[in-house]
Amino acid sequence: MAFVLSLLMALVLVSYGPGGSLGCYLSRRLMLDARENLRLLDRMNRLSPHSCQQDRKDFGLPQEMVEGDQLQKDQASCVLYEMLQQSFNLFYTEHSSAAWDTTLLDQLCTGLQQQLDHLDTCRGQVMGEKDSELGNMDPIVTVKKYFQGIYYYLQEKGYSDCAWETVRVEMMRALTASTTLQKRLTKTGGDLNSP
């Protein structure tokens, strides 16, 4: 819980930082939506972390992609969008509806959709015609493979409560990582290769 509160405080501080040329990407609204989505995921916790230890799994979150300096500005926006889209797809399923409190789940899906809508508008402003060539880029494929592993895991575990709890914790990691990328974009004004 302390980690989540620290993360929330960091998000609040970032939301007041300079947006530079990426004001569209990193608006206060987008950061507030990200913070609310993390808070909702935290509230969705129904099981003790110790009760599901046998189901824990390393899904291979591509952290080097969001923490390293491998991505250009347009790639970073595509990775952020894909992370949010895949997260939305994961929670907007019949299996997910059976596993979670529907009120919290609906709020989470609405929040993710709001972030997607905002990023989609921003991506259109920056990307223009590059969008089609970036659709097949390695970072996007990596994100898709990461989420495919999560889907396979849920199927393998029969969509059990512990499997969903493991995925909920992983989604908190994934959305935190995407927020880290947003913060890096804010600090560097969009140039991920600057110090």
From Swiss-Prot:
Cite the Pfam families for this sequence.
Interferon
Q: Where is the signal peptide?
A: 1-23
The keyword RNA-binding is assigned to this record? no
Q: Tell me which Gene3D superfamilies the record gives.
A: 1.20.1250.10
| GO BP field | defense response to virus; female pregnancy
- Report the record's disulfide bonds: C24-C122, C52-C162
The record's tissue-specificity note reads:
Constitutively and exclusively expressed in the mononuclear cells of the extraembryonic trophectoderm.
**Superkingdom, according to UniProt?**
Eukaryota
UniProtKB keywords: Antiviral defense, Cytokine, Disulfide bond, Hormone, Pregnancy, Secreted, Signal
Query: SMART domains attached here?
Result: IFabd
What broad class describes the main subcellular location of this protein? secreted
Localized where? Secreted
The GO molecular function terms of this record are: cytokine activity; cytokine receptor binding; hormone activity
Q: Write out the GO cellular component annotations.
A: extracellular space
Annotated membrane-spanning segments are: none
Q: What else is known?
A: IFN-tau genes are intronless. They evolved from IFN-omega genes in the ruminantia suborder and have continued to duplicate independently in different lineages of the ruminantia. They code for proteins very similar in sequence but with different biological potency and pattern of expression.
Q: What does this protein do?
A: Paracrine hormone primarily responsible for maternal recognition of pregnancy. Interacts with endometrial receptors, probably type I interferon receptors, and blocks estrogen receptor expression, preventing the estrogen-induced increase in oxytocin receptor expression in the endometrium. This results in the suppression of the pulsatile endometrial release of the luteolytic hormone prostaglandin F2-alpha, hindering the regression of the corpus luteum (luteolysis) and therefore a return to ovarian cyclicity.
List the PANTHER family: INTERFERON OMEGA-1, TYPE I INTERFERON
Name of the protein in its database record: Interferon tau
Q: What is the lineage of its organism?
A: Eukaryota, Metazoa, Chordata, Craniata, Vertebrata
